[in-house]
């Protein structure tokens, strides 16, 4: 279970989180949403302890393996398949030890653990993941340096998926995938047996793959159960209800204030007016949940340019 308790964090004096709290149950797949700059990627860095929190705490089980994609796979001479296989460090180390161990008891322990982690099907699993992300059998045998940075990002994604971390952090994973790869990833995430947090603007992925939404807004965290469309509906209803309550309270405050203004200096009503004034002072203002205003842009139609628009000379 991932627990975020009273998290506070600021960058250059700008607060991103202020006493924010949330709980993500183990095994849940959660979409992270919020406006650009709200702190989504920062939250991942705080979870991975790359940055220190200013206040509060983020609790992750001590034995949890956390994985994510930070950069593309190196442009090495190692094949794509071997690069992915090497991402499961425990499997890699156990297989290497099995080749050199001579103690019968230790060999038994190694092979038992290899069975537990499904190590012997590793090559088939790695090949299947690479195929899902667009690499055929021939491509899987080629060295990484033969592929562009975008394709090596897919290799890095394949590697972390193969490693099966207990907490998988994905930041806009469909940005470097084609449609087929994105559809495959949606299915993979939905079936993944561990916890997944995925930052994405891909509404389709958030409707097909996740079981909850963590919304970052106003320096806080709010967890919603369900897929993205359910979150959007619930969020809209909450906005409408809060605005309705605010309007009712505003009307009540105006009514009370009008009574006070009218009768506070009238002897027969002064006590009532004073009582109403105290009632007004004790009333906690209801603030509507604000949605930041989206700036609008107007691009005027440009004037035609006289020819020639562009001249290339001895290029």
Named regions from a protein language model:
Residues 1-244, 293, 298-315:
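ABC ATP-binding cassette signature C-motif
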Residues 234-259, 263-290:
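Intracellular alpha-helical coupling/juxtamembrane segments of multi-pass membrane proteins
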